[in-house]
Amino acid sequence: LDPISKKLKNSNSQSLNGRKIKEDLSNILNKKISIQNDANCFVLAETLFGSVKDKYPKTKNVFGIIMGTGVGGGIIIDRKVIYGNQGIGGEWGHSLLLDDGDDCYCGKKGCVETVISGKALEKFYKKISGKKLKLEDIYAKKDNDSHAKKTIERLINYFGKGLSNVVNILDPDVI
């Protein structure tokens, strides 16, 4: 949520961007509600109650990654969520990855999300193979389909490049 306008932004469910979703839901449900970014909730829960707490109990600085139809992230510093001035702290999915990449709904081109999200990888596979497949099916064919292999190699290569920028900036204890 934009901290000033209270409107949703940077959602890969683009029809929700620009909406006062918290206010809308509160009015529809006639209840007070709270809304948070999924990546922030995930990384906070893992840090305080989940696998980070279990395996690295003294950890204070964590970067959590959400990947699916979109690409997002959450930052924990000193065991607190970092929202940033505009409420988009951790949103590495909108960091530049390819200068000549596809347009992103955020208004930029070549964002991480336009390269390694599930949707982006399915689009890439279709472009090089002419076939439309879901990412799980592409992955299942990676050993006997050269286009599927190339798609998964693209994911691995660009995931590493994108994440290396986060690591160099944040230097988290755990990802």
Predicted segments, located by residue:
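N-terminal glycine/serine-rich phosphate-binding loop of ATP-dependent small-molecule kinases
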Residues: 1-41
